[in-house]
Amino acid sequence: MLKTVTNSINANQIQTPITLPGDVTLSTGNLVIGTSGKGIDFSATPGTGTSELLADYEEGTWTPSVGSNATYIAQSGYYTKIGNFVKLRFILTIDAINSGSSTTITGLPFNPSANQPVIVGGVVCYANNLATAALSLGIYAQNGSFIRFFTRNTSSTGATTQSAAVIGTLFDVYAEVSYQV
């Protein structure tokens, strides 16, 4: 039932669209969009965007992996998806990296868009027990399928994508990466 200042209206009396001359406040409950692909329309705002419809929001967990032959002590990930933008956070503690494993992180809740630039950056918040001498460890999202680690070694001048040999025993990493789907 919709209550107005002067009277009440039953649900079967409401016709869409409803235009109200001010703010709408829900004192309890949620605003539920009942049709897939619909959302909050921001087209009344200035700008020249290609889309002004917020049609998706999701939070959840995922399980990051560097391959089926690795053994893990900790393996957890969290994500937030707003529209076509995804932010991943994850923690890995790898007990042993075995053949068939790599520095490619799989198990993503959403694949990066094949239409985005080849490399979309992230940040490694913490890394410990790299098997090789490295000045830094970075992370990026590859268009279409996965995220991957890279390092800048003390013996080279540029960044290189690494094989699983870069991961040492009890390798710890906390990282975040953002990309479009």
Name each region found by the language model:
Residues M1-S65, R89, T93-N98:
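Intrinsic low-complexity, repeat-rich intrinsically disordered segments enriched
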Residues N12, T25, T71-I73, A133:
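Residues that act as N-cap/strand-start positions at coil-to-secondary-structure junctions
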Residues T16, G22, Q75-G77, L137:
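Residue-level detector of beta-strand structural context in well-folded domains
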Residues L26, T35, K81, Y140-Q142:
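Generic beta-strand structural signal
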Residues S43-L53, G60-I82, I91-A114, T157-T169:
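Surface-exposed ligand/attachment interfaces on beta-rich extracellular proteins
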Residues V86:
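Substrate-binding and catalytic surfaces of secreted/luminal carbohydrate-active proteins
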Residues L92-S145, F150-T151:
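Terminal beta-strand-rich extracellular "head" domains
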Residues T169-V181:
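Short, structured beta-strand segments at or near domain termini in extracellular proteins/domains
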